[in-house]
Amino acid sequence: MLNTYITNILGIKLTEQQNGQFDAYYNLLVAYNKHTNLTRITSRDDADIKHFLDSVLISKLVDLNKVVTLCDMGAGAGFPSIPLLIVFPNIQVTIVESQIKRVQFLQELKQALGLEFNIVHDRAENFSSKNYQQFDIVTARALGELRLILEFGVPMLKVGGHFIAPKGSKFEEELTSAAHAIKVLNVELITQDLFELPLESGFRANLLFRKEKHVSGYPRPFPIIKKKPL
């Protein structure tokens, strides 16, 4: 099913190896989820659509066929970066995850899939403050509201780099709330890719921002961000 979706929607035909990696990913996710809460989505059909396909949809926004550096903040069980890496093995992925149980899962996943990616056990804002202008792409699927993740992630982007924010049906409200952050952090909204997932599985709005200029002083310490978000 996943192969059909990706072929029909993105024009990409998965290889036998890639199909095997998605199978192994699903099997490890379900097995690990029995003792560690990683996801509420456990059926294969739902995982194919809501985890794997949903993650790979990001490739509609940027060219991942060339070598690019990508940072995934708060990836949890590896979404969206690991499905992207399976399909586009040339990208250089760094995952920043604060919860040790999820880090341990990602380490097992790395070995099971035979993929190369970096796993950093840290909070996104801490990692960001030490890695200014290091990445071509930064993304975060379920880490927080838009104005927060922009402050976490934009400082890590190279000028001209892209921040991708996968959002749901309330994306317009989040954009409104993030208007000040967008201005302060010097990013521009380039694209809103709106998509209805197959089998009435939900709505996705993938928001693409471009960094126009680097601004020092961000991200601020998390207590300040939480008390006074941009």
UniProtKB/Swiss-Prot annotation:
Q: Report whether Methyltransferase shows up as a keyword of the record.
A: yes
Sorted alphabetically, the keyword list is: Cytoplasm, Methyltransferase, rRNA processing, S-adenosyl-L-methionine, Transferase
List the subcellular locations: Cytoplasm
Q: Does the keyword Hydrolase apply?
A: no
Check the record and name the Gene3D superfamilies matching this protein.
Answer: Vaccinia Virus protein VP39
Q: Which residues bind S-adenosyl-L-methionine?
A: 74, 79, 124-125, 141
Q: What is its main location?
A: cytoplasm
Query: Can you supply one Gene Ontology CC term for this chain's record?
Result: cytosol
Q: Name one GO molecular function term.
A: rRNA (guanine-N7-)-methyltransferase activity
Q: Identify the EC number(s).
A: 2.1.1.-
Q: Name one Pfam family in it.
A: GidB
Described purpose of this protein according to its UniProt entry: Specifically methylates the N7 position of a guanine in 16S rRNA.
Query: Which family does this protein fall into?
Result: Belongs to the methyltransferase superfamily. RNA methyltransferase RsmG family.
* Descriptive protein name: Ribosomal RNA small subunit methyltransferase G
Organism this protein belongs to: Acholeplasma laidlawii (strain PG-8A)
Instruction: Give the gene symbol.
Output: rsmG
